[in-house]
Amino acid sequence: DAAEQCGYPKNADYNSGEQEGFGYFQVTQKNGRRWSTAKAFLEPALKRPNLSLEINAHTTGILTDGGRATGVKFEQNGKTRTVTAAKGVVLCAGAVQSPQILELSGIGNPNILRQYGIEVVHPLPGVGENYQDHYMVRQTWEIKKKITLNEQTRGVSLIREALRYAFTRRGIMTYPAGILAGFVRTRPEIATPDVQYHIAHASFLDVKKRILDKHPGMTISPCQLRPESRGSIHIKSSNPEDQPAIKGNFLAEEIDRRTLIEGMKIAKRIASAPALKDFVAKELNPNEEIQSDDELLDFARERGNTVYHPVGTC
């Protein structure tokens, strides 16, 4: 209702083709549990005769012959193993480790490969470049009434919810991190939304430690949907056990900064709407004194973090 009072429609299905508006998050769940692609698709297929699954296997490189991928090398239970491909190799290690595996295999920017003593199998400078991600800023408010997860996940309430989940597979333990989603256009001339909101009836005292505030709280987190800033992900040694170096380079482009600032202002307006007057006690982070664009940008740089939607690296 608060978003609608600010001029944004309600939207019960943001995957219908019309994305703009606010509504409940759509989730992938079964019987109250978050359902992964492994659960939904891989496990049911494990009995097929043409599928073999190796677990506890760490890929260390792609085998090549004459510029063609012919297999994969991996470590498993302290031993080095290889598998060969009759037709082809599909690399699907995500935006972080796919470029790492390619570079360890000699596929990538020759300057980077030679720096770590890796023979160049195929020069491909784009590997590891073009990294982009959604950058989110958590804005929080204190709530007047005890209706949030901050107090519902403590003491007797938590025990009651645990029992409710155990017997009915319902309740707060089935909730996603944010229960409401919003998609808005920060400028009227653009065709589709450029900011998404994750809205939670909870607030963190310490995000990294996942500690909730002791008082009732609410969080509205905007992120820019189509960032222009680009980072990189590259190996930092020839050792497959070493994690790659990730350079986010978030908010490097002016359009990213302007869009996120406007997204934060919209969140402030929604929290100040009449529909939330009886619920919102005060603005916490950024506080009510932080209003200018420069102040909001400083807050975004200090408190923002990735939503872990990395793409673009190979």
Go through each PLM region and give its residues.
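Conserved redox-cofactor binding core of oxidoreductases
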Residues: 1-69, 75, 138-162, 299
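FAD-dependent oxidoreductase catalytic-site/capping-region signature
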Residues: 1-16, 23-25, 144-147, 162-314
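Alpha-helix boundary recognition
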Residues: 4, 43-47, 103, 114, ...
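Short aromatic/hydrophobic-glycine micro-motifs
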Residues: 8-10, 51, 107, 118, ...
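General small-molecule cofactor/ligand-binding pocket signal
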Residues: 11, 52-54, 119-123, 198
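Structural detector for helix-capping/boundary residues
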Residues: 40, 57, 87-88, 314
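Glycine-rich loop(s) and the adjacent beta-strand/alpha-helix scaffold that form part
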Residues: 62-67, 71-164, 172, 238
